[in-house]
């Protein structure tokens, strides 16, 4: 009888201790989460009123929040450590307020996350462009070397197929030509475009010939900015990040972007297109030839657009080195290959 009582008491005590420990852990977790949320609200609230990275850095120093700058081509990105939890903070570039519709970005970003294609984004303020995403531990952006490997490209195709055939629909259409008009309207010195090269009149004329390229195409959700840095690999799972330019488009536009931005070899580019066409059941000789022609047109138009984009940014004091020249050279090279 005594043995039975001891066993019962031990069981009761274990149950009580487990309950107490669970309660303590819940209380601790709630306290930590509250602390994290308070810090996030403070940081985001400050950044909304200030687009100067140096002032944000000073604010983080003042509040003893560990951080490190991780760069970014169009925005300043900062890695934060808030109570042991890592986040990536985007300090938006003020010029981008005129270039990017943040409401579309916020909507599309959320849709992509729900589909498992994007990282968690606790904050994306549509008015200011301030964004806070969860940092993925043990993850790396894809390199140009990786993207020239068939195993990596196959994984990219799987993500593209999921994106382009998803059930959700983005609210906006991404058109290279509409974007061009917007950027050109913001360019104060128009001659910076037309006097960049003696062949600009020809380039411009050919560019506008393709304005109806998507006329009979079923537009699908697209990322539209799949540079290697926007593809994040964690173990065997691939994420597409930074949905600033996302919108409905020809799915081949995403493939064209990867070919251009990752500088794929001809073999890798052909493999990417063939694998994608196979997965979408569109791989036969005629379809492939048509797709190949459309890819070159998209690549040409992308280079023209990003050349202009760079000139707009440079007018506001940003330094992109020879990036604009490389874009223009690529456009002229493709111009000679166009059908």
UniProtKB/Swiss-Prot annotation:
Domain free text: Between 2 and 19 copies of the INQS repeats are to be found in different strains; these are thought to serve to generate phase-variable expression of this gene.
Claim: Repeat is one of the keywords in the record: yes
Sequence repeats (start-end): 4-7, 8-11, 12-15, 16-19, 20-23, 24-27, 28-31, 32-35, 36-39
Species this protein is from: Haemophilus influenzae
Name this polypeptide is given: Protein LicA
Family: Belongs to the peptidase S49 family.
Main function: Mediates phase variation of the LOS 6A2 and 12D9 epitopes. Phase variation of H.influenza LOS epitopes expressed by LicA is determined by a translational switch.
Other remarks in the entry: There is spontaneous, high frequency switching between three discrete levels of expression (++++, +, -) of oligosaccharide epitopes.
Region: 9 X 4 AA tandem repeats of I-N-Q-S, residue numbers: 4-39
Disulfide bonds: none
Protein keywords: Repeat
Repeat keyword on record: yes
Lineage: Bacteria, Pseudomonadati, Pseudomonadota, Gammaproteobacteria, Pasteurellales
